[in-house]
Structure formats: C-alpha cells, structure tokens
Amino acid sequence: MAKGQSLQDPFLNALRRERVPVSIYLVNGIKLQGQIESFDQFVILLKNTVSQMVYKHAISTVVPSRPVSHHSNNPGGGSNYHGNNTAASQQSQEADDAE
C-alpha cells in the first residue's frame, strides 16, 4: 500500500463510517457537499439528494463539518483528522484555552 493511501483510507473511512457531512472542493473551484457513501482508489461516492461519483484526481480538498478520529498504523494509536496525536492535540487545545 502506498504511503498516501495509508493516511487517506482511514480518514475517508472514518468520515464514511460516522456519516460526517463533508464539503469537497474540486480543482476547478466547485464545492460539493454531502456524506461519503463509499470510496476506492480512484473515486468517492458522495451522497446528498443524489449520489455523485467524484474522481479523486479532480479533488483539491475534503473538509469535514466536524473533527473525526481515525486510527492509523502509527505507534501511539489514534490521531485526529489533522494527523496529530490525540494527546498532543488535547495539550495544544488546553494551551490555546489558557491564553
């Protein structure tokens, strides 16, 4: 499995599994919204009032409506969607709150 897939797949799977609403921005600037129904190596099925097959090569950014947790193969277990360790992320949030 390619390194890119090892981050991409757990992230997309968490969004799919938790039915998190997402905004997907395409490289041409179009914004699509919905829930990830399914995905593979090349496409994402995005469901709103209809299902749309969106080719990954046309996607610029995937923005969840809320943070999601996903597990990777990295030592330390869980990470949030920014790719940070959950404990480090919590400490960072506490430091921000203290300011």
Swiss-Prot record:
Listed InterPro entries = Hfq, LSM_dom_sf, Sm
Give the source's domain of life in one word.
Bacteria
Q: Where is this region: Disordered?
A: 64-99
Q: Which GO terms describe its molecular function?
A: RNA binding
| Cellular component GO terms held in the UniProt record | cytosol
User: PROSITE patterns given for it?
Assistant: SM
UniProt domain Sm: residue ranges: 9-68
Query: Which keywords are on file for this protein?
Result: RNA-binding, Stress response
**GO terms under biological process:** regulation of DNA-templated transcription; regulation of RNA stability; regulation of translation, ncRNA-mediated
What is the annotated quaternary arrangement, including any partners?
Homohexamer.
- Role summary: RNA chaperone that binds small regulatory RNA (sRNAs) and mRNAs to facilitate mRNA translational regulation in response to envelope stress, environmental stress and changes in metabolite concentrations. Also binds with high specificity to tRNAs.
Entries under HAMAP family matching the protein: Hfq
Family as reported in the entry's similarity comment: Belongs to the Hfq family.
Q: What is this protein called?
A: RNA-binding protein Hfq
Per the UniProt record, the source organism is: Pectobacterium carotovorum subsp. carotovorum (strain PC1)
